[in-house]
Amino acid sequence: MSEQEDQEAPKQFTFGTVGFDARFPNTNQTKHCFQSYIDYFRCIKAKGEDFVPCKQFWHAYQSLCPMEWVERWDEQRENGTFPAPI
């Protein structure tokens, strides 16, 4: 192998998901998904988008929630019809 080929070696992908949350011990993570979505937007509303602990909720709902749900919830938030207070 040439030196250039060594430098262009692809980076290894690391797959990660949200860790265990004792509030949601069952295998069905629907409630965890929804609660993480709500918690994220409550957190950034209270502390701002740059508040690092809010990212934990973001990672959780991005990992657990189907994107179709997130898109629908985003639309509902924009329209003021989201079913939970944020």
UniProtKB/Swiss-Prot annotation:
A motif (Cx9C motif) lies at residues 33-43. Pathway: Energy metabolism; oxidative phosphorylation. Pfam families: COX6B. Disulfide bonds join 33-65, 43-54. GO terms for biological process: mitochondrial electron transport, cytochrome c to oxygen; proton transmembrane transport. GO terms for cellular component: mitochondrial inner membrane; mitochondrion; respiratory chain complex IV. PROSITE patterns: CHCH (PS51808). Keywords: Disulfide bond, Membrane, Mitochondrion, Mitochondrion inner membrane. InterPro entries: COX6B-like, CX6/COA6-like_sf, Cyt_c_oxidase_su6B. SUPFAM superfamilies: Cytochrome c oxidase subunit h. It is found in: Mitochondrion inner membrane. It is a peripheral membrane protein. A motif (Cx10C motif) lies at residues 54-65. Its main location: mitochondrion. Residues 30-73 form the CHCH domain. Belongs to the cytochrome c oxidase subunit 6B family. Component of the cytochrome c oxidase, the last enzyme in the mitochondrial electron transport chain which drives oxidative phosphorylation. The respiratory chain contains 3 multisubunit complexes succinate dehydrogenase (complex II, CII), ubiquinol-cytochrome c oxidoreductase (cytochrome b-c1 complex, complex III, CIII) and cytochrome c oxidase (complex IV, CIV), that cooperate to transfer electrons derived from NADH and succinate to molecular oxygen, creating an electrochemical gradient over the inner membrane that drives transmembrane transport and the ATP synthase. PANTHER family: CYTOCHROME C OXIDASE SUBUNIT 12, MITOCHONDRIAL, CYTOCHROME C OXIDASE SUBUNIT 6B. Component of the cytochrome c oxidase (complex IV, CIV), a multisubunit enzyme composed of a catalytic core of 3 subunits and several supernumerary subunits. The complex exists as a monomer or a dimer and forms supercomplexes (SCs) in the inner mitochondrial membrane with ubiquinol-cytochrome c oxidoreductase (cytochrome b-c1 complex, complex III, CIII). This is Cytochrome c oxidase subunit 12, mitochondrial. It comes from Schizosaccharomyces pombe (strain 972 / ATCC 24843). The lineage of its organism: Eukaryota, Fungi, Dikarya, Ascomycota, Taphrinomycotina.
